[in-house]
Amino acid sequence: MPSTSIAEFREVLRNAKNIIAVAGAGLSAASGIPTFRGAGGMWRKYDAMSLATPEGFADNPSLVWQFYHYRREAALKADVNAAHLALASFSIPRIRHTVAPGSSFTLITQNVDGLSPRAMKCVLQGWDGVTLPEDPPYLIEMHGRLFDVKCTQCDHVELDTSSPICEGLAGTEKLVEQAVLDPEIPEENLPRCKKCGSLARPGVVWFGEMPHDLPLIDTLVEKADLCLVVGTSSTVYPAAGYASEVSANGGKVAVFNYERTMGDDDADFLFLGGCEETLPKALGLPDKPASEGAPASSL
């Protein structure tokens, strides 16, 4: 039976040296980003295979782009929540070392909403000259980003946070909310590659495609002695297997989820409830870890 003791968790945290967090849709639920597989998941009305596969895009790029335009608009309107901010703060060595001295940390997120990097900007705002460690990286977005636009022909990738991304999709997010999609938007009116002019696609990792940075992730998972599972039901591989691999290697696993899932079997600690409440409380980070004038080299 997993422990629910914050004191015991903090003792493990204090002694951990190589920490990873594996995050899923539940991390962003409190920000108003709909989850896919929960009871209220927005995919309940649609076939996921028709919306999140290369084959689905080839069959109906208009339908797929309307769906991802809806997700882009939702992400642009969303605010980061306390769990995003806690993980961002924990990524900064000076802050993290107050509760986990001498440790490294990487957040491996399955989310594509861009809220984790936005949270880091919020945490770092006003800190002149602060830099984050590059080895290991503080964040890996293994399933890509909603705001990356990838060419279907030349593979050019470009960050585009414009709203709407193109005039042909303007207002269609309201149709998605009503579960009425218009499949008749001409292909020439969908997003195009700014380099070669060909049809572009959302720059996310679809089912059947290879997630980003797998060799690096495998190395981090193999070294990890503590894995935080945050807002994920541990059903999508390879991420679903990371916690069990850490556990098999002798590391500890702490799960922060709204409700119990199959992934709890590997947990040493289980904190149920919204992770925007449970995670900051469990980490116990100081409110103000350093002065405004702290030298960048110490961070």
Curated annotation (Swiss-Prot):
One CC-aspect GO term: mitochondrion
Broadest EC class assigned to this enzyme: transferase
Amino acids binding Zn(2+): C151, C154, C193, C196
Pfam families reported in the protein's UniProt record: SIR2 (PF02146)
Cofactor binding note from Swiss-Prot or TrEMBL: Binds 1 zinc ion per subunit.
Record's catalysed reaction(s): N(6)-malonyl-L-lysyl-[protein] + NAD(+) + H2O = 2''-O-malonyl-ADP-D-ribose + nicotinamide + L-lysyl-[protein]; N(6)-succinyl-L-lysyl-[protein] + NAD(+) + H2O = 2''-O-succinyl-ADP-D-ribose + nicotinamide + L-lysyl-[protein]; N(6)-glutaryl-L-lysyl-[protein] + NAD(+) + H2O = 2''-O-glutaryl-ADP-D-ribose + nicotinamide + L-lysyl-[protein]
Subcellular location: Mitochondrion
MF terms in GO: histone deacetylase activity, NAD-dependent; NAD+ binding; protein-glutaryllysine deglutarylase activity; protein-malonyllysine demalonylase activity; protein-succinyllysine desuccinylase activity; zinc ion binding
InterPro entries xrefs: DHS-like_NAD/FAD-binding_dom, NAD-dep_sirtuin_deacylases, Sirtuin, Sirtuin_cat_small_dom_sf, Sirtuin_class_III, Ssirtuin_cat_dom
Active site: H143
The protein's name in its UniProt record: NAD-dependent protein deacylase
